Amino acid sequence: MAKISKRRQAFAAKVDRQKLYAIEEALSLVKECASAKFDESIDVAVQLGIDAKKSDQVVRGSVVLPAGTGKSVRVAVFAQGEKAEQARAAGAEIVGMEDLAEQIKAGQMDFDIVIASPDTMRIVGTLGQILGPRGLMPNPKVGTVTPDVATAVKNAKAGQVQFRVDKAGIIHATIGRASFEPTALRSNLSALIEALQKAKPATSKGVYLRKIALSSTMGVGVRVDQGTLAAQ
């Protein structure tokens, strides 16, 4: 732990917490810090100009990152008949109805995302207290309650990430791994920012994207100059 602290302190000394770094430099600094023995995730925190206490200003959605997340995702799907077959063909590891619900109630949750066809919500709705606290409850706002379960499965496998603003008005998301090329991380970040722009509440006033900061799993935050995101 002492070694980690020393490494973190050494990196922190290189970063001016008040400075806005061009995206290329910010990514370079973050990747430099990601020197742990595992492939650290590269995360982004976006401070939004919204009032998270107001229900009409809750920002929530999903986006498929063009370069993926670098993570293997196991998908469970509530569907029956033809839709169940389509889900399996699309790559879903677990497909079921009441049997899947019973597995979940028994604590057997070997999956990372749950997708549901609308006609199965009578079953899924009974699992809210189990799936909700784990962030696994299907929701149409993030595309996990849909009649097109096959596409939802493919999106999840392709690197779809869900986002939801927290109580402080901040969006937290992973845009890749330290092993990713800077161009891949940048394209993923751009896709996320574009999705956030599209999800902007009509009642949000003033500056919407207030602050953007990047960090690795074990690193410190590096603030990004938003003006450099559009530059190619």
Swiss-Prot record:
A GO MF term: rRNA binding
Alphabetical keyword list: Repressor, Ribonucleoprotein, Ribosomal protein, RNA-binding, rRNA-binding, Translation regulation, tRNA-binding
Short name of any one Pfam family annotated for the protein: Ribosomal_L1
InterPro entries: Ribosom_uL1_bac-type, Ribosomal_uL1, Ribosomal_uL1-like, Ribosomal_uL1/biogenesis, Ribosomal_uL1_3-a/b-sand, Ribosomal_uL1_CS
One GO cellular component, as annotated: cytosolic large ribosomal subunit
Stored PROSITE patterns: RIBOSOMAL_L1
KW Oxidoreductase (keyword) present: no
Keyword 4Fe-4S: no
GO BP field: regulation of translation; translation
Function: Binds directly to 23S rRNA. The L1 stalk is quite mobile in the ribosome, and is involved in E site tRNA release.
Family: Belongs to the universal ribosomal protein uL1 family.
Subunit record text: Part of the 50S ribosomal subunit.
Record's protein name: Large ribosomal subunit protein uL1
Organism, scientific name: Burkholderia lata (strain ATCC 17760 / DSM 23089 / LMG 22485 / NCIMB 9086 / R18194 / 383)
Lineage: Bacteria, Pseudomonadati, Pseudomonadota, Betaproteobacteria, Burkholderiales
